[in-house]
Amino acid sequence: MIDALKNGEIKAPYMVVTYNQTKGIGSRGNSWEGLGGNVFMSFCISEDELPSDIPPPTISIYFSMLMREVLSELGSKCWLKWPNDFYVDGRKIGGTLTNKVDEIYICGMGINLASAPENAGILDIKASVDELVWGFVSMLDKKILWKPIFSKFRIDFCKSKSFITHIANRAVSLQDAEICDDGAILLNGEKVYSLR
């Protein structure tokens, strides 16, 4: 999608949804292959189509929390691990990755609905791809401000403290991390933003 946007083949807003992903990119540049029966979507949206109070480095948190809201409304107990992973019962069920080209955000999101790689989980409720995609689009259209989104994320962040995250290619415990109002974390006196 990034190349298509740069080449002028598509214009924001634009979304693609698939049940199989063969050339996905995960966090830290890892390749990502999605298993069949799950939902994978990529979309691009102009920065001026979003609430102006969103701190740009935390846009993945914002998009992820919108989807988490959709899942919660459908009855899921999923939560968001800092900075961009969906979890149920201690297992990762999906994630979000966002890039920016000029004033356009490009976001990829995947959620395991039916199958999962080893050591990962699947969504804890039955939900269709249409329910998730259209629910997400509806949430996006509401242009919910950062503050109410962040207040819910702050609660989820407490669960993140029993996990690790990767910072500068190192596995780092989140046990002593503190969340900042802009979605960054304070870790050992250093402010760290998610660049995913």
Predicted regions and their residues:
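N-terminal lobe of the biotin/lipoate ligase/transferase fold
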Residues: 1-69, 73
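Long, positively charged amphipathic alpha-helical accessory segments at protein N-termini or as interdomain linkers
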Residues: 7, 48-78, 88-196
